[in-house]
From Swiss-Prot:
Source species taxonomy: Bacteria, Pseudomonadati, Pseudomonadota, Gammaproteobacteria, Enterobacterales
Cysteines joined through disulfide linkages: none
Positions contributing to substrate binding: 19-23
Listed Gene3D superfamilies: 3.30.110.120, 3.30.420.360, 3.30.420.40, 3.30.70.100, 3.90.870.30
Transmembrane segments: none
Record domain Acylphosphatase-like: where: 8-92
The protein, known as: Carbamoyltransferase HypF
Species name: Escherichia coli (strain K12)
Length: 750
C-alpha cells in the first residue's frame, strides 16, 4: 500500500522507446502492479513518474520490453508530487532537444498478418494494416515528437472505430500513429493507359498484369519497386531493356522462405526484413537473367501488407528492383513515378499515403555482413566507443558514391540511409531533404562539418558552402576508423594496423590511394605500404573499362605483354594512343587502386565486358569465377619490395601458369591475400601491435576476406559486419576521427 507522502520517483528511460508502443506498455504494466503516476514522451526518451517504489516495475520493464523497443539506460531520481496521483495516466508529449532514438520502419507483424487474412475482420485484406509492433515509422515522420499530427497520417482523421483503438490502453493499436482502416485510411489505386481502379479492384488489376508477364510499378514503404515474374525470362529481359540495366543483379521477393538456409531465414523474418544474398542453388526456379555470371542472388520476403497480399495470391517469385531510371534516384511520389517510369512500367499500383523519406531496401549477406544499410536499420542510433563523451554536434558528409551522412553528438551517432551517387541532381535534392529532416527530428545544429580530403567531391564543396568550421579527413583513415567504431575500439585503445582496399580515395599529398596498409588510431594515420601506383588511362573511364587497367598493368610490369593471349581484350582496342598518353602523363593519374587491379585481372581472364554496366561488375564476376574453385596449389606470389607488393613478379608467374580459369582466379585472390597478410604481419610485429583492421569496398569480397583471415589467424581481426565496408560506413569514420581530435584539443569547438 502506498505511503501518504508527496515523495515519489522519476525515471528517465533512454533508448529505442518512441514509436514502439512503449507508453502503452508502461501504462499496462503500471495497471498490473497497481501503480500511480504518469508517463510521457519527450525529446530525451520516455519519462515515468511514480508514487510508489519502482523496483518490481523496473524488473518487469526489462523482462517484457516491446519487440521493437530497446532500453539503453534508466536513470532515477526523487520527485516531489504537488498533488498525489490517484491513477496512472499517459501525459501529452513534450518537446526539447532530441536525444532519444527514432524507430526504423518494421515489417508486418504476425498479429496484423493474421488479422488481415481473417474474413470478417474490419481490416480484412487491408493493405495498410499496422500496429505498435509494425508498419511505417521513419518514412512517414515530418517532425518530432513521434505523434500522429507530425506524420503523414495527419491527412487521415481517425474514424470512430480506429479512434477507440487508438485511445484504448489495452489495445495493441494504443497510440499507434499510423493506425488506419478502409474507412479512414489510405487506399490503393491502379493506373494504366487510361484505366483506373481502386482498392481491391486495383490490387486484382496489378495481379492480372503480373500473371501476364507485364511490369508493374508498386509503391511501397520507402519508394517504388518495379516488379515482374522472376521465372519469366521474357518479362525480365523486357525490364532490363526498358530500364537500361543489362547485367546488374535484380532482387527477388519470394512468397515464403522454404528451402533457404536457417541463417538467411532468420534475417529475412526480422522486423528489418532486408534483402539477403544467398547461393543461387537455393532458388532454382528463377530465370538465368536475374543475376548473370554471379553465384549469389538477393532474396527478400514481403515486408508490408500490400506485398503480402500480392505474393499470397501470385505464389511465385517476383523481381522487386528499385523504381528508378538507370542512374537516377528512386521515385517516392506518385507524380514522380508516373513521369519517370511511364516508359518502363505497364501499370502503376499506387496509394495516397505520402513517403517523406526515400528508403531503399537494405542488403545483407547470409552471414549478417551489411552491404547496404537503409530500410529497417535507419535511423537506429549507434553508440560511440568508450571514451567518447560530450562530443559537440558534428555533421559528417561521407563520400560522393554510396553516400551516407552522419550526425554525431554526445555519445551517439546517427547514420543516414543509403543515398547513392551525389553527382546526380535528383539525389542531391533527396540528400538535402534527408539532412533537413534529420536535423529537424534530432534538433541538431552542427558546430562544425567534416568532409573527405578530395577537394573535387560534391560533398567537399557543400562543406565549404555551409559557413561553418570544417575538418578534412583522409578517405582511408575514415574507412579504418569506421570499422574501429563498429567494434567499440576504445578512444584510448592505441594503434592498429589497417588494410583499406577500394577503388580510389584521396590520400596524403594528393596521392590517389586504394590498396593501403596503414598504422591507425582515431586521431592519426600513417602510411606504411601497399600496392604500387599504376596509371588510370582515361581517368574516370578506367573505372568503367577494365581493359584499360590491364593495359596500364602490362605497360608497367609485363615487357612482353603482347605475346600473351590474356591481353587480347587490350589488343582489340586502339591501345597505342592510350600508351602514349600514359607515357606523357596525359589524363592518366597514378593510383594504388585495388579495385582497378581486380578489373585488370578480370579482363585478362575474359570475365569482364569491354565496358561495365554497373560498379563492381568485373570484380564480382572474378570472385564468382574463383568461388567455383575450392582451392588449388599454385606458383603465384606477390612478394614485398620496399613495403609494396611486387606486381611484376605476380604477372610473370600468373601469366606463365597454365591452369583452368577458375583456378587462376582463385590463385589471384590467394596470392593477393598472402601478400597483404605478410605486409601487415611485418608492420604489426615490429610495433608490438596485435589487432588488425580491414575496410574498404573490396573487403566485401568473401574469398579475399576468408584468405586474409586464414593467413592472419593468430591476430585479433576486425572486419566490418553491421556497417558496410565500403563508402556507406565512411561518414561514421569521419565522425569518430573528428570527435577524437576535438576531445584531444586539436580542434576548436566552433
Amino acid at each position: 500500500m502506498a505511503k501518504n507522502t508527496s515523495c515519489g520517483v522519476q525515471l528517465r528511460i533512454r533508448g529505442k522507446v518512441q514509436g514502439v508502443g512503449f507508453r502503452p506498455f508502461v501504462w499496462q504494466l503500471a495497471q498490473q502492479l497497481n501503480l500511480h503516476g504518469d508517463v510521457c514522451n519527450d525529446g530525451d526518451g520516455v519519462e515515468v513518474r511514480l508514487r510508489e517504489d519502482p523496483e518490481t516495475f523496473l524488473v518487469q520493464l526489462y523482462q517484457h520490453c516491446p519487440p521493437l523497443a530497446r532500453i539503453d539506460s534508466v536513470e532515477r531520481e526523487p520527485f516531489i508530487w504537488s498533488q498525489l496521483p490517484t491513477e496512472f495516466t499517459i501525459r501529452q508529449s513534450t518537446g526539447g532537444t532530441m536525444n532519444t532514438q527514432i524507430v526504423p520502419d518494421a515489417a508486418t507483424c504476425p498479429a496484423c498478418l493474421a488479422e488481415m487474412n481473417t474474413p470478417g475482420e474490419r481490416r480484412y485484406r487491408y493493405p495498410f494494416i499496422n500496429c505498435t509492433h509494425c508498419g511505417p515509422r521513419f518514412t512517414i515522420i515530418r517532425a518530432m515528437p513521434y505523434d500522429r499530427p507530425f506524420t503523414v497520417m495527419a491527412a487521415f482523421p481517425l474514424c470512430p472505430a480506429c479512434d477507440k483503438e487508438y485511445r484504448d490502453p489495452l489495445d495493441r493499436r494504443f497510440h499507434a500513429q499510423p493506425v488506419a482502416c478502409p474507412e479512414c485510411g489510405p487506399h490503393l489505386e491502379w493506373v494504366s493507359h487510361g484505366e483506373h481502379a481502386e482498392q481491391e479492384a486495383a490490387l486484382q488489376a496489378a495481379i492480372a498484369q503480373l500473371k501476364m508477364g507485364k511490369i508493374v510499378a508498386i509503391k511501397g514503404i520507402g519508394g517504388f519497386h518495379l516488379a515482374c515474374d522472376a521465372r519469366n525470362s521474357n518479362a525480365v529481359a523486357t525490364l532490363r531493356a526498358r530500364k537500361h540495366r543489362p547485367a546488374k543483379p535484380l532482387a527477388v521477393m519470394l512468397p515464403v522462405a522454404d528451402g533457404l538456409p536457417d541463417a538467411a531465414r532468420q534475417l529475412l523474418t526480422t522486423p528489418a526484413a532486408p534483402i539477403v544474398l544467398v547461393d543461387k542453388k537455393y532458388v532454382p526456379e528463377l530465370c538465368d537473367d536475374i543475376a548473370p555470371d554471379l553465384n549469389e542472388v538477393g532474396v527478400m520476403l514481403p515486408a508490408n501488407p500490400l506485398q503480402h497480399l500480392l505474393l499470397q495470391e501470385l505464389q511465385c517469385p517476383l523481381v522487386m528492383t528499385s523504381g528508378n531510371l538507370s542512374g537516377k534516384p528512386p521515385a517516392i511520389s506518385n507524380e514522380q513515378a508516373l513521369a519517370d517510369l511511364q516508359g518502363i512500367a505497364d501499370g502503376f499500383l499506387i496509394h495516397n499515403r505520402d513517403i517523406v523519406q526515400r528508403m531503399d531496401d537494405s542488403v545483407v549477406r547470409e552471414s549478417g555482413e551489411m552491404l547496404r544499410r537503409s530500410r529497417g536499420y535507419v535511423p537506429d542510433a549507434l553508440a560511440l566507443p568508450p571514451g567518447f563523451k560530450n562530443v559537440p554536434p558534428v555533421l559528417c558528409l561521407g563520400a560522393d558514391l554510396k553516400n551516407t551522412f552522419c550526425l554525431v553528438r554526445g555519445e551517439q551517432a546517427v547514420l543516414s540511409q543509403h543515398l547513392g551517387d551525389l553527382s546526380d541532381d535528383g539525389i542531391q535534392m533527396q540528400w538535402r531533404e534527408a539532412l533537413r529532416l534529420m536535423q529537424n527530428i534530432y534538433d541538431f545544429t552542427p558546430q562544425y562539418v567534416v568532409h573527405d580530403a578530395h577537394p573535387g567531391y560534391v560533398s567537399s564543396q557543400w562543406a565549404r558552402e555551409m559557413n561553418l568550421p570544417t575538418q578534412t579527413v583522409l578517405h582511408h583513415h575514415a574507412h579504418a576508423a569506421a570499422c574501429l567504431a563498429e567494434h567499440q575500439w576504445p578512444l584510448d585503445g592505441g594503434d592498429v594496423i589497417a588494410l583499406t582496399l577500394d577503388g580510389i580515395g584521396m590520400g596524403e599529398n594528393g596521392a590517389l590511394w586504394g590498396g593501403e596498409c596503414l598504422r591507425v588510431n582515431y586521431r592519426e594515420c600513417e602510411h606504411l605500404g601497399g600496392l604500387p601506383a599504376v596509371a588510370l588511362p582515361g581517368g574516370d573511364l578506367a573505372a568503367k573499362q577494365p581493359w584499360r587497367n590491364l593495359l596500364a598493368q602490362c605497360l608497367r610490369f609485363v615487357p612482353e605483354w603482347q605475346n600473351y593471349s590474356e591481353t587480347a581484350s587490350v589488343q582489340q582496342q586502339n591501345w597505342s594512343v592510350l600508351a602514349r598518353a600514359i607515357e606523357r602523363g596525359i589524363n592518366a593519374p597514378l593510383a594504388s587502386s585495388c579495385g582497378r587491379f581486380f578489373d585488370a585481372v578480370a579482363a585478362a581472364l575474359g570475365c569482364a565486358p569491354a565496358t561495365l554496366s554497373y560498379e563492381g561488375e568485373a570484380a564480382c564476376a572474378l570472385e564468382a569465377l574463383a568461388a567455383s574453385c575450392h582451392g588449388v596449389t599454385h606458383p603465384v606470389t606477390m612478394p614485398r619490395v620496399d613495403n609494396q607488393l611486387d606486381l611484376a613478379t605476380f604477372w610473370q608467374q600468373w601469366l606463365n601458369w597454365q591452369a583452368p580459369v577458375n583456378q587462376r582466379a582463385w590463385a589471384f585472390h590467394d596470392a593477393l591475400a598472402q601478400g597483404f597478410a605478410a605486409l601487415m604481419r611485418e608492420q604489426a610485429t615490429m610495433r608490438g601491435i596485435t589487432t588488425l583492421v580491414f575496410s574498404g569496398g573490396v573487403i566485401h569480397n568473401r574469398l579475399l576476406r576468408a584468405r586474409l583471415a586464414h593467413y592472419l589467424a593468430d591476430f585479433t581481426l576486425l572486419f566490418p559486419q553491421s556497417l558496410p565496408a565500403g563508402d556507406g560506413g565512411l561518414s561514421l569514420g569521419q565522425g569518430v576521427i573528428a570527435a577524437a581530435r576535438w576531445l584531444a584539443g586539436e580542434v576548436q569547438n566552433g
